Amino acid sequence: MRKNKIDIISLGCSKNLVDSEHLIRQFQANGYSVEHNPSRVDGEIVVVNTCGFIRDAQEESIDMILELGRAKKEGKIKKLFVMGCLAERFMAQLIDELPEVDKFYGKFNWKEMLNDLGKSYKEDLSSERYLTTPKHYAYLKISEGCNRFCAFCAIPLITGRHKSVPMDTLLNEVKYLVSQGVKEFNVIAQDLSSYGLDLYGKMMLPELIDQMAQIEGVEWIRLHYAYPTQFPYDILPVMAKHDNVCKYLDIALQHSSDKVLNNMQRHITKAETIDLIKRIRKEVPGIHIRTTLMVGFPGEGEEEFNDLVDFVEEMRFERMGAFAYSEEEGTFAAKHFDDIIPEDVKADRLDKIMEIQEEISNEIQSKKVGNVYKVIIDSVDEVYYSGRTEWDSPEVDPEVLIPVENSKLEIGNFYQVEITDATPFELFGKVVG
């Protein structure tokens, strides 16, 4: 056990990661040595930033807490703190069932942790973070919470109503991160589309991205988690105008069937969804759309699933993920629908939709062979440098693999790369020029 050292373990999404990065910076400013996601826990204090979104994530968080609880009983750590979405959602229950935890903090009161340790939260560092990602890219969380209340989703139950971060705060954070070497900003929120409504009375995502794009040193801006209903169309000319705004949009559509969309409380129709996609592609030529779909939601019969299959084949999304519905405690769907679709049927539907997407992805990727693209290098191993194009977000999208042999590239730098081969999930290339 190392005195005056704190280990922070982040579970779940990139939004959680940003919270951990802000907390690490505060701990450092208060004199602590901090390690993020250590291979071996040896700090006298351990903080677990939990995820509570879906059942698998909840179980992962609980397993981690139990493991660290055993380490505490063995005297390997002195204090165990738990924060984040799981703690926010199930605070009372966790306090009763996990007495080995010294204190639970929710999603928004983690600043109290500093006070409990006899330290103070430093407001002048509110825009500063310790980057846990490679130093050339960062996630920028522009809001917290969601006002949409989709039937299947527990996020509003955890994070509450939509709360935007003031634009000045975000722009200062971007400038700080640029000064630390960040070139690529992945803009994230539960609902990008609603940014600014609560603070400024109107959707301000276009203004925010326009101002970010003008900051010297910002090479790439990528948008994650837009909402299709009340989509801020003014963002499209901003994307088309600025070369450093990636032609990429992550927008979760969930389904195509009007019946299922209505059950999901998405407040959009299939026809409106198709019009949205067509307009995005028309106004931002070359854009790659990433979406997420759900199979097995209550009301999805064979007709509705076949509608989804036809939709995927027609829309030909450049990037797509999918998952099978699982009932979440407290949601509208859990209260009002019976989850009666057998799990094996859900699994078969998921496999089918992803097989179709794999074929589409293979065709789209193959068309890149012979072309030259701007690629940022993320990492290297004994065989390949791993990089990404503007259409590829960290962790979730295809990589560009460049042989180490006869190449000497710098991590975090951009290169012109000719694509020589492709699979649905990878591109292979060589540096040119």
Located regions from the model:
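Conserved SAM/AdoMet-binding glycine-rich loop
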Residues: 79-84, 89, 94, 179-303, ...
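Conserved, mostly hydrophobic/aromatic
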Residues: 150, 170, 187, 223, ...
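Glycine-centered loop/turn positions within well-structured domains
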Residues: 111, 148, 193, 258-259, ...
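Proteins enriched for Cys/Gly/acidic motifs involved in redox and nucleic-acid/cofactor modification
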Residues: 1-195, 234, 249, 271-278, ...
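Active-site proximal loops enriched in glycine and acidic residues that flank catalytic Cys/His/Asp
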Residues: 189, 225, 253-255, 291-295, ...
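Terminal RNA-binding accessory module
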Residues: 333-433
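Short acidic, glycine/proline-rich loop/turn micro-motifs
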Residues: 261-264, 332-336
